Structures are given as C-alpha cells and as structure tokens.
Amino acid sequence: MTMDSDNGYMAAGELLKALAAPLRIGIVTELASGPRCVHELVDALGAPQPLVSQHLRVLRGAQVVRGARRGREIAYSLTDEHIAHIVADAVSHAREGR
C-alpha cells in the first residue's frame, strides 16, 4: 500500500465510523433532501432533541454536515452530496440482504 492509499483508507474509515449509528444514518437521509433545523429532524425522526443534537455534533466533527444560521436557528446540510449516495446505497444493500 502507498501512503496515499493509507490516507484514503483512514479517511474512509473515519467517515464510516461517523455514520455508524442508525440515527446518524436517518439524519443524513433527511438532509439529503435539503437543509433542516434540529426541530425538523426531531419531528421527522421521532428522536429526542438532545440526542439529535449530540449526533449532529458527531457528524459536524467528521465534516459530514455543516450548520448555517437561519434566524434564531441553525439549518444543517450535508457537506457533500456523495455522502447521501453512500448512505442510500448502504441502506438499499442492507434491505436487499433481508
């Protein structure tokens, strides 16, 4: 393996680690259709607000999502549309296996 492939594998591993929670997969799926505020994610996913916020922090730290102020709220969006495709493919693959 080369240094470049090692770095690519490490980056991919970090991305997959950040996505390795069902609620985070749900958040990414919701954000695939556009920016959402925390309360919109809470309503869509049926999860408590503190838990959604905690998972958003993990996704922000992994640079999967970014936040932009929208009035008194922060609207979260995906940093890269490829992430939505990765998650959609993973969910589709998991459903096929059942």
Where are these regions (language model features)?
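Short beta-strand "wing" residues that participate in macromolecule-binding interfaces
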Residues: R66-G67
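Alpha-helical DNA-recognition elements
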Residues: V58
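N-terminal helix-turn-helix DNA-binding core of bacterial DNA-binding proteins
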Residues: M10-P50, R70, I74-H82
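Residues within the DNA-recognition helix of helix-turn-helix
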Residues: H55
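Amphipathic alpha-helical dimerization/coiled-coil segments
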Residues: M1-A11, T29, E81-R98
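Short acidic/polar alpha-helix capping motifs at helix-coil junctions
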Residues: T2-S5, C37-V38, V52
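Glycine-centered, phosphate/nucleic-acid-interacting loop/turn motifs that mediate DNA/RNA or nucleotide
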Residues: Q63
